[in-house]
Amino acid sequence: MGVPVTFALIAGVLLAVQFTQISMQSMVGQLFHGIDSEALLAVPFFLLVGELMASSDVVQRMIRLAQTLVGHLRGGLAQVVTLFSMFFAGISGSSTADVAVLSRTVAPEMDREGYDRAFTAALIASASTMANLIPPSIMAIVYGATGNVSIGGLFLAGVVPGVLIGLGLMVYSYVWGPPGFKKKRASYSEIALASKEAAMPLMIPVIIMGGILSGWFTPTEAGMIACVYVLLVLIPIYRPRHVYELPRDFMYAGLLYSLPLAAVAAASAFGWMVAYLRGPDIVSTYITGIAGTSGPMIMISLVVLFIIVGDFIDAVPAIIIFMPIINKLTEIGNINPLHMGVVIITTLVFGLITPPYGLSLLVASKYVGVGFGRAVVRSLPLYGVFLLTIAFVVLFPDVVLYLPKLLLPESVGCFKAPGGTGYICPN
């Protein structure tokens, strides 16, 4: 019907106030309680980093590095799109920012080389979803803040599914995608030069994750430090003549943040209302009636549920609304909360390219100038990459949680062994 999700959620809350014993005062309190989180303050900083990078010469340097590494392969520009998305995912944490950057920079060149615009939109949208998995992921921040799960652990756990999606898209582009123009393989000196030019912006993920893992700062402080690094180091080097654009970048990042912030507030009130009406008990009883108390079966049931939910609702409000249900089923199935978190996020990421919602695909198709329906058709073969990744994340938790266990063992429930000689982790 075209009604924004935030307004629809608030309408549901108002109906509950009208026809139940819930007071308006309680609901207003929940609206503000939902956004009263220090962790959520990290989101605008990461959005600002992405916007500052997108409007500078830094992006071109990262694209040149991707071209020297994979531009000679079959489907060269398609490979470049995917590899650049991996790079940029480690900076912005926003798939929308990734779509905007790729649509402005690489999409016109793909058009000149004869790539079908529908394929270009489908690939850009699919590749941009890695920004929601590879740290710093905004979805991980929201999930961690709402579900009381380690954000640093979610960052690390998202690396495996993010890289798997990237590799899957590159394999598809190589085997079945348009061939593109044949280009000469870059020499070692060209690769070294491109790496040197892109080294400073690629330090941002190192600063973010290094600081969080070492305990030097929280995710929110990591976002602030990344902003300072971009403003005081990268911009003077890469964009000295366009400082007058900074207010616009700040304003745009604020606008980008206001949309999910409003959704978070509305979803928090709606989720509290659902919990008050015993929604989690009803849904969890229904799911356990089908899947039993088996952890894998509960997880598969939730995957099916969130594939459907992701088709109609944005990921951020979906996470907040369903968090009470997720927590209850995680406890019933004796599932590691970190594993459950990365499964839910990976599944919701799939919804960014599936109709009728498909936000990333919708934005990419508008930027590229192709109908949404045509872009959906060209996306269908790429769905296999996402479904295989989801299956892998569900079936192989030890692989997905390897990095958190190695670098942040407390995030997966490990505790120090007597004598402090190591960690003991749950099976």
Describe the function of each predicted region:
Residues 1-427:
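Alpha-helical transmembrane segments of multi-pass membrane transport proteins
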